[in-house]
């Protein structure tokens, strides 16, 4: 075995050398095992050797889009025989399989320390995972006795870079740490929390020349550069099917962590590597601990992380269920785990940092909605964002993102500094938050081409950084504004500049629901698209409605964005916005301490409100104003506000709904589409529906009394006109008109027709059986087909226009909630006494009745046998038939007596038809009980009469 030397730097990973006897053959590729360190398999050819050596050109690493370096930077896999180099394991294996024919010979794997024999590298990997899980490196010696390749594995005496169990082995230049994301530097303790620094330029040290020169067949092995999900170091495998393991997702914030005292300036160094495009990556690995800049964390305010909590099953299950626990979940975990709540919060924060989880409050709420189908309000976690100037010089090149749970800290870019940062920290005095202190920080960046300082960030930037405002101060000392109110990362992305936000906020203060003209004006001023403007208004309204206290927006000096956590600037709920809008200056929107605070609720509700419960007086005033101008000016709105005692928002909402209704009605009139099966009755039904829509609007938003008086005043012709020719069309037909009411009642329609009904339109009086059949079909389908119409016409004997009209009236009544019988018929609760008789049986009974005019007792059994009906049903049918005949005779006698006594014709007609109409649309199922109820009667429409019906 060749000699092995330690690096002069104690923290450097030692170089491993594998001795190969002269019988060795081809080199084998680098393989990875999740439980052990990553090694190169020894070569199998005496003249070929392979090593995983650092590539000086790749020490900078592969740059990701967010500025972090790839986990594969620093080393390449090299075949010394071919001088072939590859940074990807799969690519290197492909080379070995194609170029070296003896590579595929299966060796036997032997662990000399445990006398363990394995036939394949997978078996040895499992053995290493079970018996050598704590070892950091292995030494492989390849022999070839009897032409059979044997790989002997031994554990070296010293492994200065051993990694604790459960930790991630990352690249040789990064920091190896425990799972603790926030820690204190414990000097003088050789325990898990001690940080080992691995020298970054170790592969390029000249001391490496002092290594013994490998003999023929010897090869040098260096650990590769991979991280693994389970946190363990990789081992050696010889399978050609292996792929690069996925990178670790637990890259916590690490480094020297000084405490940031309040009011004291400290300097922080940020080292940024130049970006290098990643090669051979199917996906971008997450940033490692080395590539993350170091961020200051006030450790005095954060409890010590307890590593023992990682094995708690309650905590792990809760985190896997949802990474952001609610208050109730924290209380439950406090009880079952016996850990304090603050310790639990720190643990959850650490786990989220490991997994790279950083969600906004909206994302947390949406995720809870999707997972639990509930809405749980969560308090947004304050964040700290650090950016240096070269990163924001290009809107799409924002690479650094550092977030930590620091309450009340904000980071900005002070003017005049090339790489400086401005960190603010709140000052607490007697429990009250005073004005903020600004702490300048310096950053060291790799030299880059100079870029001019910018004041804005492009609106189409797709970065994940919370707030960006480069080359200008993000904080001004203002006594009335707290530093915690300075930054609301949940509302503002880095999409809009100060000028854009000023224009948007100025418009939002005037009207939270901008019109189309205002949106177009904002798009011209800000350069944003219409969709972005509307989305900004929607998001802003959402936060005003859901946050504990609505946050007023005030632009401050030097382009800083200031958001007050207490609403000092009231939002006037104006309904109209002038066409020409002036963009206010930065000082015009600043709230002074003497500003009178409005008394409106701090969390206004922007949900739509129904206005049907308004008093008739209010509706009358609103209707009059709407008739004059559907878009009232400001003076009219003020007058309506004082007269109706309604709020500005309510008035604006009422006018908006009213305009929508008018537009809807106009659209319906323009379209005028009708079902094809209603062609014969389309004209009459269209007039009914059109009139119903006209009358329904005042019933909802206006005063019925005012509308009725207006309609009666316009009527020129009295509707009470009797055409004697139409008094008796059939023995079962008639028409009811009440002269006392002064309007003409349609038979099935509950609306008052304000026009004279044409004499040619005849309303048919329907029997209880006919209504029963119609209702049964209506429950089955509200829009019958042509076949349904033909069938119901055959069953009832009614003409098609009458059936079509009845269905139209019933649909309208159902829409307005006036069809009382619908639910009972839908449940199958039919009125007593109604028979469902087949057409053939009805003809038999009808013929018998026309012959005998009454039911003979001796013929009862014969009729029962022929019709398959019971005796009670046959008797009931004859009773109903005789009742109809009696009513018809009464109609004739009343008509004959009317002119003879000299009374008005209309009065006699009403007296004669009043009872005959009782059975038309009765809602009562007692045949002998007349009821004053109308099935399509609309209470919201103006009514001056009521139909009386009974079965």
UniProtKB/Swiss-Prot annotation:
GO biological process: cell differentiation; negative regulation of DNA-templated transcription; negative regulation of transcription by RNA polymerase II; positive regulation of osteoblast differentiation
Sequence segments annotated as region (Required for homodimerization and interaction with NFYA): 238-483
GO cellular component, one term: nucleus
A Pfam family hit: Homeodomain
Zn finger limits (C2H2-type): 77-100, 109-132
Residue range(s) of DNA binding per entry: 300-359, 489-548, 607-666, 759-818, 830-889
Disordered: annotated span: 1-66, 227-252, 662-690, 916-951
Entry-annotated residues carrying Phosphoserine: 599, 703, 718, 922, 941
Segments for region (Required for nuclear localization): 1-107, 492-550
Regions of compositional bias (Acidic residues) in chain numbering: 677-690
This protein's UniProt keywords: Differentiation, DNA-binding, Homeobox, Metal-binding, Nucleus, Phosphoprotein, Repeat, Repressor, Transcription, Transcription regulation, Zinc, Zinc-finger
Compositionally biased region (Polar residues): 937-951
PANTHER family: ZINC FINGERS AND HOMEOBOXES PROTEIN 3 (PTHR15467:SF6), ZINC-FINGERS AND HOMEOBOXES RELATED (PTHR15467)
Subunit structure: Homodimer (via homeobox domain 1). Heterodimer with ZHX1 (via homeobox domain 1). Heterodimer with ZHX2 (via homeobox domain 1). Heterodimerization with ZHX1 is a prerequisite for repressor activity. Interacts with NFYA.
Protein name stated in the entry: Zinc fingers and homeoboxes protein 3
